[in-house]
A protein has these predicted regions:
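Fe(II)/2-oxoglutarate
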Residues: 1-35, 250-267
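Short N-terminal signal/transit or membrane-insertion segments
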Residues: 1-26, 89-110, 145, 161-167, ...
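Short, mixed-charge, low-aromatic patches
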Residues: 6-13, 73-79, 124-128, 160, ...
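Residues that form generic nucleotide/phosphate-binding pockets
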Residues: 22, 26, 53, 57, ...
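Non-heme Fe(II)/2-oxoglutarate
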Residues: 29-123
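Amphipathic alpha-helical surface "interface" segments used
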Residues: 73-80, 140, 144-148, 255-261
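A general structural signal for short secondary-structure boundary/capping elements
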Residues: 85-92, 192-194, 215-219, 254-259
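Catalytic core of non-heme Fe(II) oxygenases with the double-stranded beta-helix
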Residues: 100-236, 240-248
Length: 267
């Protein structure tokens, strides 16, 4: 797989299938943790050679666009966006240089694959059944993988994630373990409304976590400190894709974001 960046389009599809199979094995081998809510913790999500290429072939800062939603409220006073993103869909990354495009095309295709989705659904069954009932496996899930970059000043207060989301996955992409203290924090909400910190993910190379979104999946991130240049990760979100409204919404958002992205490249 170390030749990913020079493969033809056909061979990239085959490489994506192989990468998806590796990710499925990582999901199947992940640790299941019950508290403060059911979640998975990953080690070695990607093969070592692919992970090394991902670090080497990160997009330039100008390739990213602002992340909206909760992140927008934490822009710096001068207007600098503390979280930016690139959607890892073919139509978004096609403007990247050929070597970078080839790699991130493989990564994006693998993350959006059916085997990876089914692996998450299988391993997150306790959380999904709690929300959707015994027929949780029949609930449609629409994957959206985005490469995110946070800079010092970024933070997000405790929240559960919107009900539009079914599964939240974050895969960390640091070069080393020098700043393991900036990982996502998990909380437990007590009867008095307080939300003490119960655990924190380590921001370590090639690690991550996943959970089925529910009304108890409280999580946050402390401000990224100045010892960090960037906090890079992949957010893989599975949006609930069940019913006409949600199906149209998910595809409409993808189309709308594509139009905005194309406009940005043309001005």
């Amino acid at each position: 797989m170390d030749q990913t960046t020079t493969l033809s389009a056909y061979d990239r599809r085959r490489a994506a299938e192989r990468l998806a199979n590796f990710i499925v094995e990582s999901i199947d081998g992940s640790r299941a943790v019950e508290k403060p809510f059911f979640h998975l913790e990953f080690d070695r999500v990607f093969p070592d050679d692919i992970y090394a290429q991902m670090l080497t072939l990160m997009p330039e800062s100008t390739d990213y666009r602002p992340m909206h939603g909760r992140s927008k409220g934490h822009d710096l006073k001068d207007g600098t966006h503390t979280r930016v993103k690139i959607d890892l869909f073919p139509e978004y990354i096609r403007n990247l240089p050929s070597e970078k495009h080839a790699l991130w095309d493989v990564v994006g295709r693998a993350l959006c694959s059916e085997p990876v989705k089914q692996a998450f659904i299988r391993r997150l069954a306790p959380g999904l059944s709690k929300r959707f009932g015994d027929q949780f496996a029949k609930v449609g899930m629409y994957p959206i993988p985005i490469l995110t970059r946070d800079i010092p000043g970024y933070l997000i207060t405790p929240h559960t994630d919107t009900h539009w989301k079914g599964i939240t996955v974050q895969l960390y992409l640091p070069k080393d373990d020098a700043n393991t203290d900036i990982g996502t924090i998990f909380h437990e909400k007590l009867p008095d409304g307080s939300m003490p910190k119960k655990s924190q993910m380590r921001f370590a190379p090639n690690t991550g976590y996943a959970f089925a979104v529910g009304n108890d999946t409280w999580h946050s991130a402390d401000p990224v400190h100045n010892r960090v240049k960037t906090r890079d990760s992949i957010l893989l979100t599975y949006f609930v894709d069940h019913g006409v409204l949600k199906v149209l919404r998910n595809r409409g958002k993808r189309l709308g974001n594509f139009v905005l992205n194309e406009f940005r490249y043309r001005i």
